[in-house]
Amino acid sequence: MAAPYQREQAAWIPKTRLGKMVAEGKITTMEEAFETGLPIKEYQIVDALLPDLVDEVLDISMVQRMTDSGRRVKFRTTVVVGNGNGYVGLAQGKGVQVGPAIRKAIENAKLNIIKVARGCGSWECGCGLTHTVPSQVEGRAGSLKVVLMPAPRGLGLAAGGPAKKVLEMAGYKDVWSRTEGETRTTINFALATYKALESTTTVRTRQKEEAQ
């Protein structure tokens, strides 16, 4: 079960323009932060604006590399963060120990946070609630393609492993999915799903422009 990210840290001293605006109380929501158009370069910005964010470790793998001084081992972790209500982030982290690698992945995932679009896009439903993707979207990572399609309320998440967890963290309840390619690599499966969700906002924006 995912748990809130808790870590002892020194008082945050923002270094970026957006960070200073958040610390001064000029920016109080993630939507306002995105509207500035400024990049999120400090994970503490997300901590401040999304205090209900939780994290889940999707994969931990050991990477070995031969050097002149001998064999060196590092751990590579894949983590997804989300608040179950429209925000999700995904990233990897590396370290000589598992703990620091996980913490780095969490921080990186927060820097990759996105707001996804939700709706009731299934012709089988029409309930008007925000429980599925608003339209069909797809994402690619390596040789893998993930296609997400609107599903009727009550179906659940018809997706496997990492994809299901990413969808849950983003706040989706019902989604059809289809994959093309190799799904055994956790990072590619999760990343392709994340990229598909990333395009939900693009699709929604384009539809609004066409309607005007």
From Swiss-Prot:
Alphabetized Pfam families for the sequence: Ribosomal_S5 (PF00333), Ribosomal_S5_C (PF03719)
Keyword Transmembrane helix: no
Domain S5 DRBM: residue ranges: 53-116
InterPro entries xref list: Ribosomal_Su5_D2-typ_SF, Ribosomal_uS5, Ribosomal_uS5_arc, Ribosomal_uS5_C, Ribosomal_uS5_euk/arc, Ribosomal_uS5_N, Ribosomal_uS5_N_CS, Ribsml_uS5_D2-typ_fold_subgr
GO annotation terms (biological process): translation
UniProt entry keywords in alphabetical sequence: Ribonucleoprotein, Ribosomal protein, RNA-binding, rRNA-binding
Gene Ontology CC annotations of this record: cytosolic small ribosomal subunit
Single annotated GO MF: rRNA binding
Coiled-coil residues: none
Free-text function comment from the UniProt entry: With S4 and S12 plays an important role in translational accuracy.
Database matches in NCBIfam families: PRK04044.1, uS5_euk_arch
Domain notes: The N-terminal domain interacts with the head of the 30S subunit; the C-terminal domain interacts with the body and contacts protein S4. The interaction surface between S4 and S5 is involved in control of translational fidelity.
Quaternary state and interactors: Part of the 30S ribosomal subunit. Contacts protein S4.
Family listed: Belongs to the universal ribosomal protein uS5 family.
Name this polypeptide is given: Small ribosomal subunit protein uS5
Organism per entry: Methanocella arvoryzae (strain DSM 22066 / NBRC 105507 / MRE50)
